[in-house]
Amino acid sequence: MPTIQQLIREERSVAARKTKSPALKACPQRRGVCTRVYTTTPKKPNSALRKVARVRLTSGFEVTAYIPGIGHNLQEHSVVMIRGGRVKDLPGVRYHIIRGTLDAAGVKDRKQGRSKYGAKRPKPGQAPAAAGKKK
């Protein structure tokens, strides 16, 4: 415990907060160009082929970003928008690609949670494409 004289001489330093998404540089989103689109496997105990992309951002960083949703149209040189948000079972993936903006198309036939996947509202007159339950 410091004395009052020591505190007068040198005040307490506040611990600096470390950001979880440094490549965004305090912006909510960033634009970037895909340099590589590939699949990778998650940590134990999960098993899948997760779709990810290596993205070179306008901030100068090159990061790995997750492509959410079923199916995508991204390839090398696609221009995408990324946001923060890690994927718990993919080490090193700290960003998500925003679907439905720039070159990343929205998820097809998405009925619920559409805003998170850039899907347009389905027309009310259309018959349901994949009716789950039938009585």
Swiss-Prot record:
Keywords: Methylation, Ribonucleoprotein, Ribosomal protein, RNA-binding, rRNA-binding, tRNA-binding. Residues 113-123 have a biased composition (Basic residues). InterPro entries: NA-bd_OB-fold, Ribosomal_uS12, Ribosomal_uS12_bac. GO terms for biological process: translation. One of its GO terms (cellular component) is small ribosomal subunit. The keyword Ribonucleoprotein applies. Residues 106-135 are annotated as: Disordered. The modification 3-methylthioaspartic acid is found at D89. GO terms for molecular function: rRNA binding; structural constituent of ribosome; tRNA binding. Residues 124-135 have a biased composition (Low complexity). Part of the 30S ribosomal subunit. Contacts proteins S8 and S17. May interact with IF1 in the 30S initiation complex. HAMAP family: Ribosomal_uS12_B. PANTHER family: 30S RIBOSOMAL PROTEIN S12 FAMILY MEMBER. Belongs to the universal ribosomal protein uS12 family. This is Small ribosomal subunit protein uS12. It comes from Synechococcus sp. (strain JA-2-3B'a(2-13)) (Cyanobacteria bacterium Yellowstone B-Prime).
